[in-house]
Amino acid sequence: MPLPPSAAPDPIARFRDALARAAAASPHDATAAALATADARGAPSVRMVLVKSADARGFAFFTNRESRKARDLAANPRAALCFHWPALEEQVRVEGAVTPLPDAEADAYFRSRPRESRVGAWASRQSAPLGDRAELEAAVREVEARFPGDEIPRPPFWGGYLVAPERIEFWRSGPGRLHHRTVYVRRGDGWEVGALQP
């Protein structure tokens, strides 16, 4: 299959264009992606995250660093992301190594979050067992009492991660399930691009 005309040399620019089209077509959580990780034994797990930036460095997301995903990444620092935009009939898959983002970037993003989200970040022991909802609500009240104003510092157990892409695949629906697939593979400082069978 010949390369489609949209096979631009820069997959990050192509992704950002697709994301803009997805946000225009269906603005609710266009940045949501399935994040797949695996623990030290290779046991996989997947969940949705919001990707907050995509640039030449990679794809950034933020989370509790004591969560299952963070424990997986500490043991096995590789991950895959999958963006699916039904309104466009397109998806993008990203695979690569994962590293923690600098604290300064985590601080800046944390400050931009709504107050209730910052409170929730302190109150939730993400992925830990929960006895009942009252336990969590009590933790929220305790955090609100501790930080009565708008200045709520970033918890030391909360931060960001960067997926540095080594492989990015763009998929677009085609008639008769003859879909269009273009893959970019990192080669040194550049990208090798090619088409895949549907």
Curated annotation (Swiss-Prot):
GO terms for molecular function: FMN binding; pyridoxamine phosphate oxidase activity. Belongs to the pyridoxamine 5'-phosphate oxidase family. It comes from Anaeromyxobacter dehalogenans (strain 2CP-C). Catalyzes the oxidation of either pyridoxine 5'-phosphate (PNP) or pyridoxamine 5'-phosphate (PMP) into pyridoxal 5'-phosphate (PLP). Binds 1 FMN per subunit. Homodimer. The gene is pdxH. It catalyses: pyridoxamine 5'-phosphate + O2 + H2O = pyridoxal 5'-phosphate + H2O2 + NH4(+); pyridoxine 5'-phosphate + O2 = pyridoxal 5'-phosphate + H2O2. The keyword Oxidoreductase applies. Pathway: Cofactor metabolism; pyridoxal 5'-phosphate salvage; pyridoxal 5'-phosphate from pyridoxamine 5'-phosphate: step 1/1; Cofactor metabolism; pyridoxal 5'-phosphate salvage; pyridoxal 5'-phosphate from pyridoxine 5'-phosphate: step 1/1. Pfam families: PNP_phzG_C (PF10590), PNPOx_N (PF01243). Its EC number is 1.4.3.5. NCBIfam families: pdxH, PRK05679.1. FMN binds at residues 47-52, 62-63, 68-69, 91, 126-127, 171, 181. Keywords: Flavoprotein, FMN, Oxidoreductase, Pyridoxine biosynthesis. It is an enzyme of class 1 (oxidoreductase). InterPro entries: Pyridox_Oxase (IPR000659), Pyridox_Oxase_N (IPR011576), Pyridoxamine_oxidase_dimer_C (IPR019576), Split_barrel_FMN-bd (IPR012349). This is Pyridoxine/pyridoxamine 5'-phosphate oxidase. Its cofactor is FMN. Substrate binds at residues 52, 109, 113, 117, 177-179. One of its GO terms (biological process) is pyridoxine biosynthetic process. Signal peptide: none annotated.
